[in-house]
Every structure is written in C-alpha cells, then in structure tokens.
C-alpha cells in the first residue's frame, strides 16, 4: 500500500518530535535486532507514528485538492456591491477586553453598517453556559438580539459557532440553549442549520446586502481536522475603501487579499480579525488536544512538526503592508502577543487593538 512507502516512513522518522526515539523507531522499521526494552518502546511508539503517517497522507491529498480548486475557481467582479457610509465593529467576544467584560479564545463581533446590524460569529462558550459569555457581554454593552439583521459564520469551528457540540450538529448557537432568531438570516460557509433563523450556504462570492459581500467559502486543509471552509466579508465604505473582516484566517492572507482584489477595483482600506499567528509562542493557557497546543500545532495548515515561524508572520505583514492599509486590527484569540506587537510596530498609528467592548469606528 502506498502509505507504507519506506522512504516516506524514514522522512517522517527524521521529523519525529521525540528525537531520542528516532534510532529505536528506525531500527524497528528496518528489522534490526532490538533489546526487549527497545522493542517495548518501539511498539508503544509505532501506533502514533503510523497514525501520523496516515494523517499526513490525508493532509497532502487534501492540500493538493484545495490548491487545484483554488487554481481552477473563476470568480467575477462584484461591480454592483454599493457602499455604506458608516461602519462600526464592536467586539463582543475575543481574548482581550476592556474592563471586566468576559473573554474567550473565540470570536464574535457586532458590525453596525449604517442602519443594519450583523453578528459575525458566535464565540466559544466552552462550558456551554446559559446565558453564555456572549449574551452576558451583549447585555453589559446594551446590545440586543433585535439589533441583528444578519448573522455571518466564518467557519465551522467551535470557537466561532458557540462550542464544539454545535460543530457536530452543523449548527451555530449564541448560548448553551438556543435563542429565538426567527427575524435573522444567517450566511454560512458550509451547509448549517438553526432552529429558528433562516440559513443560506454561501459557496462563491456574493453580495449579502448593499455595501457588504462574502468573498466566498475558501477550502483549506488542516492536518488533524481534515478540511475547513472559511469565508471572510468585505465591506465597501464610502470614500475610504474595502474593509475585510476575518474569523481565523485559515485561508491564508494571500488568498484572502488576492480574492478581494479580484472581486473589487476599490483599494483595501483595512483588515480586522484573526489571522492565526501563534508565533513564536502562544499564551500558556492555549487549550490542548492530545497534549499539543491547539492554536500552534493543531488547527494549522501544516503538519505538527512544521510549526509556524517568524518568517511566516513576516510574510503576512509584508503582504498586508504592500496594500498600504489605513487600519489593521489583529484578533488576540489565535495570535500571540509577539505577533500583535509586530503588527503594532509595522503599522504604527494604523494599528488598533481588538478588545471586547472597544468599538472600532471606520
């Protein structure tokens, strides 16, 4: 079978995180004589190594498929998007806050565009409380469910749809118990449902309402969790330009910006949200999965033995800087303080902190 290719196994062994065990695993694979202790150790390690090999096979296949899809997908300009005069983004959930508002490693932003209200993602609510941190922060900030005309879900991950339990059901929720959203229309990057809200699966780029568009659901592979489809939104602000709002940035900054520049002739004014830059280290309370930090090793577009480096962050910075944006705000829910400080140093007065309760006015 192809996944047992010896050269691939040897390559994986060279990259195996537990360096002290490489020699034992190599001897085991090549059939060399092992001591009883070495054999016991090799058997303990062979299953996770074999699992990593299978995951790597799936990842490489998905990576190829996603790149082929990206290369062959043709999108047309959204010439008739229109504009909004006023735009405000109020973070309701993120990792940093003003005062004593609740924080999570999740995202939920209240977008006010002229007279329209949009809820972008619905946070994490890790303990499935009701009312959730999102609802508690809304109450403290004077935001009500009636303020939302639309909900936009960036992607189907627990920290953006209200918790992992809703991921399994392909749903989103604002709290541990579903709330009445019968007046709301939701736009999702994959087929999703809600007990009361109307939902629409967004595949390609489309205008949601005057001045606001989805750039379309973009497919990308994750090593452990298969594939993720993520959409960002573009808001055309009168006399300023396109403001991009991103959930986690699993698409990669190049695909996000390239897609926006194909869709619109209007220059990019700003970019706000998560870009997944846990470089070089994330805060010590990064949630773990099987002993590995989630944001640094698990939900990335790379194998765990190829974590993100400062070069990747610098590439992101350079790609954004080349557009001369007037506003940049990086979500702390999936990026390290080192990355946030690098953004501050690069964009100077154009940089704005994302904090729960702190309104960003465009």
Annotate each PLM feature.
Residues 92-95, 122-123, 155, 188-192, ...:
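Fold-independent oxyanion-binding glycine-rich loops
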Residues 2-114, 205-222:
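Zn-dependent metallo-beta-lactamase
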Residues 77, 175-233, 344, 352-361:
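Metallo-beta-lactamase
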Residues 130, 162-164, 170, 197-198, ...:
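Short glycine-/acidic-enriched loop or helix-start segments at secondary-structure transitions
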């Amino acid at each position: 079978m192809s996944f047992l290719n010896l050269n691939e196994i040897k390559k994986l062994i060279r990259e195996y995180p537990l360096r002290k065990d490489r020699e034992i695993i190599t001897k085991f694979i090549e059939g060399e004589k092992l001591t009883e202790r070495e054999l016991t150790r090799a058997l303990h390690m062979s299953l996770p190594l074999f699992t990593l090999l299978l995951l790597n096979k799936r990842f490489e296949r998905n990576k190829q498929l996603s790149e082929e899809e990206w290369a062959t997908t043709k999108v047309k300009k959204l010439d008739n998007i229109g504009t909004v005069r006023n735009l405000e983004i109020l973070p309701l959930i993120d990792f940093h806050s003003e005062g004593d508002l609740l924080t999570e490693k999740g995202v939920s932003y209240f977008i006010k565009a002229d007279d329209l209200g949009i809820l972008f993602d619905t946070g994490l609510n890790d303990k499935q409380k009701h009312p959730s941190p999102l609802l508690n922060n809304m109450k403290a900030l004077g935001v009500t469910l009636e303020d939302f005309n639309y909900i936009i879900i960036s992607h189907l991950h627990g920290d953006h749809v209200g918790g992992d339990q809703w991921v399994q059901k392909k749903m989103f929720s604002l709290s541990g118990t579903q709330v009445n959203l019968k007046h709301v229309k939701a736009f999702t990057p994959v087929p999703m449902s809600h007990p009361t809200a109307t939902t629409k699966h967004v595949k390609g780029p489309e205008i949601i309402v005057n001045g606001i568009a989805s750039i379309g659901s973009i497919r990308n592979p994750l090593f452990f969790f298969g594939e993720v489809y993520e959409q960002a939104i573009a808001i055309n602000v009168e006399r300023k330009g396109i403001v991009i709002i991103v959930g986690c940035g699993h698409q990669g900054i190049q695909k996000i910006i390239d897609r926006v520049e194909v869709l619109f002739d209007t220059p990019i004014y700003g970019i706000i949200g998560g870009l997944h830059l846990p470089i070089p280290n994330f805060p010590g309370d990064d949630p773990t999965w099987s002993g590995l930090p989630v944001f640094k090793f698990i939900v990335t577009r790379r194998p765990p033995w190829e974590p993100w480096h400062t070069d990747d962050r610098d590439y992101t910075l350079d790609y954004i800087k080349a557009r001369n944006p007037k506003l940049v705000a990086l979500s702390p829910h999936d990026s390290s303080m080192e990355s946030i400080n690098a953004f501050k140093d690069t964009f100077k007065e154009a940089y704005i902190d994302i904090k729960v309760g702190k309104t960003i006015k465009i």
